[in-house]
């Protein structure tokens, strides 16, 4: 009888564990299970982040390399010069797993990566503008006479506009469930899980382009 009871207890424990894993992986917390791709049709979160970060960086380089300029500046509406991937993924996971037809995010397939891309660009818009800037230079000629020279340069300003997770929740008309998921994923107690999931792309991990940078223009 004891052996039977023990066996039943073990089976129940296994069932409970499996049920908990299924529940968690099917909720917004499933994003923490997406560190590894389960099959050839899926990719891990880090792989998706690397791909999309590369696309973002390519856009910055495209602007810098094709828009004619003499000097280049980069500005951000919040003085942040990197993608806050933790926030992007929290919005993504809450949106996908919390909607009426919620799907698990424990693995990322093509359709989900496309949605993640959409959210990433919505939260990290890139624009640019150019303007002339004239500088007056006072020098002396070979005879010691003062001379004034004006130099007009074209300044390229790359503009980064970031949206917060709260702004995205409003834009996407989050339901109560989605907002609850978002708040849970932003709880400080999960910082270690985010760091483990994102690795070098964790919150604040590296600038994509330094502010007030200059480069030789290659555009025409």
Task: Identify the meaning behind each predicted range.
Residues 1-219:
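Membrane-proximal envelope biogenesis segments
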């Amino acid at each position: 009888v004891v052996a039977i009871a023990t066996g039943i207890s073990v089976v129940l424990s296994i069932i409970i564990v499996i049920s908990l894993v299924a529940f968690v992986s099917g909720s917004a917390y499933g994003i923490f299970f997406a560190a590894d791709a389960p099959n050839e049709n899926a990719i891990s979160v880090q792989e998706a982040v690397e791909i999309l970060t590369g696309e973002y960086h390519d856009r910055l380089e495209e602007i810098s390399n094709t828009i004619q300029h003499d000097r280049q500046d980069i500005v951000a509406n919040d003085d942040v010069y990197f993608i806050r991937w933790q926030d992007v993924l929290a919005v993504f996971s809450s949106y996908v797993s919390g909607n009426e037809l919620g799907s698990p995010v424990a693995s990322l397939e093509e359709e989900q990566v496309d949605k993640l891309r959409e959210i990433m660009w919505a939260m990290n818009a890139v624009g640019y503008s150019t303007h002339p800037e004239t500088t007056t230079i006072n020098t002396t000629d070979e005879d010691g006479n003062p001379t004034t020279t004006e130099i007009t340069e074209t300044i390229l300003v790359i503009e980064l506009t970031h949206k917060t997770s709260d702004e995205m929740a409003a834009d996407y008309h989050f339901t109560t469930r989605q907002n609850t998921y978002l708040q849970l994923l932003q709880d400080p107690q999960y910082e270690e899980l985010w760091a483990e999931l994102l690795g070098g792309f964790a919150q604040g991990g590296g600038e994509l382009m330094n502010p007030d940078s200059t480069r030789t223009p290659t555009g025409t």
